[in-house]
Amino acid sequence: YRCDINGLLTWFHSQNFANINDSSVSSYFLYLQKECGLQAKSIRRKYVALGQYFNFLKLEYNINEIFFRFTSRKFHIPRNLPKTLSNQEIKNLISVSAAEYQDSTSDYKRRLNTRNMCIIELLFCLGLRIGEAASLNLDDYCPEDCTILIRGKGSRERLLFISSPIVCQKLNLWIQTRLEMSPTTTALFINRYGDRLSIYSIENIFYKYRDLSNINPNATPHYLRHSFATQLLNNGAGIRDVQ
């Protein structure tokens, strides 16, 4: 933070300001943005550093608070547009996972490919985080009405309806196939040893099919979540419903 504070003081000297006040501090941050071209995150760090420094001066030296009104402001970082996959990229990703299932050369590969195909479908169809997919249990899914209970951040639960009959069929197929892997847990998705599939394993499954389908090489599993939300909005869903 020392460099941030020194930067402010150096700039004040160069501008010949008589004193440091709310207006001059605002001019400094405008300078950082317009003249220096700093990103919002870098500006926010300087903002926090100077706010702490000025509060220190206020407490230690009883500086008049009128000069530090800016420290109570909210500094907003503009959000970047969410990164998504195109419709064609999503089709490629799902098609590759389905093709690998169809081309399975052994029972062992068939079991794993069934699971992987189902994971890719669910990540997009429901807009799941990979942590949510990893934490799913067998009894979270109700095949009769094709609903699934999701446990999100902060222990929040939401009951989702799987609208695609094809995805429901693939999920039912996986549940049957899962029994062949001698499960040792109630987890919906398991590894070859029968244990719960980890978040890192689900990440690797996504990256495998990402590379095989020749889509955006920088795509992460979260792209599917953003793509799901984007499609909902494009189809008329309200922003609050999507959130």
Residue ranges of predicted features:
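Conserved catalytic core of the tyrosine transesterase superfamily
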Residues: 1-243
